[in-house]
């Protein structure tokens, strides 16, 4: 091999480098289910109102969830990232306390 070939940067020469692009993988955030628990004291209409106000459910969807809670003891209001789920639970609990209802709202990892 002559000196000219080494200076030209041939693919097998010492000046060869490989550039690779690494695309970082973005991890999806964990999701949490927001659940309402049944009790014997909170009026059904109040539960429907909570679902409309805090979870943007229409009357039909809110009523369906409320009846599920009434018959099964628990019902899912929505699935959110941690911060949003935590905020929703706090809002519902504060609203229920303000209106003197024992309604319970919890979150669990999906």
From Swiss-Prot:
Residues 1-24 are annotated as: Disordered. GO terms for biological process: protein catabolic process; proteolysis. It comes from the Bacteria. Residues 8-19 have a biased composition (Polar residues). Pfam families: ClpS. Signal peptide: none annotated. Binds to the N-terminal domain of the chaperone ClpA. Involved in the modulation of the specificity of the ClpAP-mediated ATP-dependent protein degradation. Belongs to the ClpS family. This is ATP-dependent Clp protease adapter protein ClpS 2.
